From Swiss-Prot:
GO CC annotation terms, alphabetical: cytoplasm; plasma membrane
Subcellular location(s) per record: Cytoplasm
Source superkingdom: Bacteria
Keywords, comma-separated and alphabetical: Chaperone, Cytoplasm
GO aspect biological process, one term: response to hypoxia
Keyword Cytoplasm: yes
Official protein name in the record: ESX-1 secretion-associated protein EspG1
Chain's role: Specific chaperone for cognate PE/PPE proteins. Plays an important role in preventing aggregation of PE/PPE dimers.
Main location: cytoplasm
InterPro entries: EspG
A Pfam family this chain is assigned to: ESX-1_EspG
Gene that encodes the chain: espG1
Record text on subunit structure and interactions: Interacts specifically with ESX-1-dependent PE/PPE proteins. Interacts with PPE68.
Family membership noted in the UniProt record: Belongs to the EspG family.
Amino acid sequence: MTGPSAAGRAGTADNVVGVEVTIDGMLVIADRLHLVDFPVTLGIRPNIPQEDLRDIVWEQVQRDLTAQGVLDLHGEPQPTVAEMVETLGRPDRTLEGRWWRRDIGGVMVRFVVCRRGDRHVIAARDGDMLVLQLVAPQVGLAGMVTAVLGPAEPANVEPLTGVATELAECTTASQLTQYGIAPASARVYAEIVGNPTGWVEIVASQRHPGGTTTQTDAAAGVLDSKLGRLVSLPRRVGGDLYGSFLPGTQQNLERALDGLLELLPAGAWLDHTSDHAQASSRG
């Protein structure tokens, strides 16, 4: 994920605007915007219970953010920063990802893709730092997730589908061939599942009028290895949860995310009623 050149400094590049802040910095910005809730995955929550100590810390953080151009001289967030943080705090849809990076010692990177209206924001947390990017909608959901994960060669495998609980018990190539795939594909699947360099679980949520949310009870996935990338998508058929595994192309990642979003009440990333209204207003 491409970050700005300096921590806490807002920057622009083409159709992406980004800012990097500490958790304390995010809490100060959220306080200015009267926001208290953020996607759970990011773990943005008050971290200084003593009010007097918090005020001292926040005063210094505000000075730093002002010097870096994130806040103006009146202590208010720069407009684009405010838009990004409001999108995180009051999203219409959210993808929440947890990325376990076995290739760098088991570090977990937490990230989200949020939509509010037609505004899209990516946010990733690594330690106490948060990187936010405002992204053009035409980048697409797969492109936004790949902005965090980076590109990878798709694994050379056939599609594999089965009941999720049954597939979870398959650890050998011989078990996987029972699902009708060729032995060569089964061996690749077994190797990737047994020796991944990283894996990602992504869930989706929808915000309803009044502020309540619904989250999917299943996850889409990305699995990286030396043999390439796999993606998995959940589907419900007759009450059973099925999992489908596919080579990790951008098109298949988009399919996986679309399949995940179908589990939400709205069934999609966009609100079709608002899309229709916007189309009507454009004539």
